[in-house]
């Protein structure tokens, strides 16, 4: 048989997933943290490619994140055009300054953004423009001062109004990249406001913070990105500066995962940058890495499938 008469490779075969260890863990998995084009920075794939690759790998859900824009519209388009592939796709708003900042009006728009009956499935506080991250990046005092923070007492406006909107819509509140103490205060305040779906990025926290937020009913998120070499490359945002955040060794991340009460943890790839493999392969490598470091397969299954499916109300076809 010559090359011209061979059947074309499926996308799964092209990615080499079928024969790789850990590929079976992707069946029914949910990756709630994917960055894809269109985007201000280069990405390894576009939204449609991300959905197709997820479908070929057997994933059931995909969450699109964008630090510069509301991603709910792209998600709605992907569901309409590629819904037959069986992957539920959603987006939401990260309240970074380029996306409108911490604004109740921007939240209202995001919650209604899409086709009729659709909208954002998560609302996140800033992930880069926070004082916590600005200090980690070594930003100037003036830059730090302009960033978001949560005071020790009370909530800054318009956060109470935003909490009411999130609670009424029953979507996920993501605490963003704030300090550990801020995250605990935010979860407590969100619970008081009636928010029931809360996700806390915990890769850089200590075990006490992970235990505290999960004991309050939140889910702790752990992402592949922070355990990789990509943390060594300076990230460009809307300015010309490049900054890095500290990496997290896999054994240390495993200890944090084990601190989550009742295994209230969610695993994600946070892939899309060219320095890392595409999200599907990044997620496979992450799961295999955690398994190698001692996390049992049953626990991995809960954290990559069951927990995010419940948190994001993943729709099955």
Protein language model regions, located:
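Hydrophobic faces of well-ordered beta-strands that scaffold small-molecule active sites
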Residues: 28-34, 62-64, 90-93, 121-125, ...
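Mid-to-C-terminal alpha-helical segments outside catalytic/metal-binding sites
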Residues: 7-8, 280-317
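Extended substrate/RNA-proximal surfaces in nucleic-acid metabolism proteins
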Residues: 85-87, 96-201
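Histidine/acidic-residue-rich catalytic or RNA/ligand-binding cores of hydrolases
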Residues: 40-44, 72-75, 183-189, 209-214, ...
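Short acidic/histidine-rich active-site segments
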Residues: 261-279
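Acidic (Asp/Glu)-rich catalytic clusters
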Residues: 23, 75-86, 109-119, 164-167, ...
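Active-site beta-loop-alpha junctions enriched in small/polar residues
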Residues: 35-37, 67, 92-98, 126-130, ...
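An N-terminally biased module of ancient metal coordination in phosphate/nucleic-acid-related enzymes
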Residues: 1-87
């Amino acid at each position: 048989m010559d090359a011209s008469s061979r059947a074309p490779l499926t996308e799964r075969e092209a990615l080499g997933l079928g024969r790789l260890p850990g590929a079976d863990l992707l069946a029914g998995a949910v990756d709630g943290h994917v960055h894809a084009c269109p985007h201000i920075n280069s990405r390894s794939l576009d939204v449609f490619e991300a959905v197709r690759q997820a479908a070929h790998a057997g994933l059931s859900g995909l969450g699109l994140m964008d630090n510069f824009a509301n991603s709910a519209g792209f998600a709605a388009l992907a569901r309409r055009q590629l819904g037959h592939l069986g992957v539920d796709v959603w987006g939401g708003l990260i309240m970074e300054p380029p996306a409108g900042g911490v604004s109740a009006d921007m939240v209202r728009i995001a919650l209604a953004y899409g086709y009729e009956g659709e909208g954002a499935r998560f609302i996140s506080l800033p992930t880069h423009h926070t004082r916590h991250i600005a200090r980690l990046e070594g930003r100037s005092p003036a830059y730090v001062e302009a960033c978001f923070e949560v005071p020790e007492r009370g909530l800054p406006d318009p956060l109470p109004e935003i909490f009411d909107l999130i609670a009424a819509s029953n979507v996920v509140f993501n605490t963003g990249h704030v300090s550990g103490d801020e995250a605990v205060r935010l979860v407590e305040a969100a619970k008081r406001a009636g928010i029931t779906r809360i996700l806390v990025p915990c890769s850089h926290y200590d075990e006490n913070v992970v235990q505290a937020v999960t004991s309050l009913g939140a889910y702790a998120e752990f992402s592949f990105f922070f355990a990789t070499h990509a943390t060594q490359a300076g990230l460009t945002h809307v300015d010309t500066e490049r900054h890095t955040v500290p990496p997290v060794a896999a054994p240390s991340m495993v200890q944090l995962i084990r601190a989550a009460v009742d295994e209230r943890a969610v695993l994600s790839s946070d892939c899309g940058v060219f320095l890392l493999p595409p999200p599907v392969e990044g997620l496979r490598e992450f799961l295999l890495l955690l398994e190698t470091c001692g996390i049992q397969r049953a626990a991995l299954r809960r954290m990559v499938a069951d927990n995010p499916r419940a948190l994001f109300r993943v729709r099955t076809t």
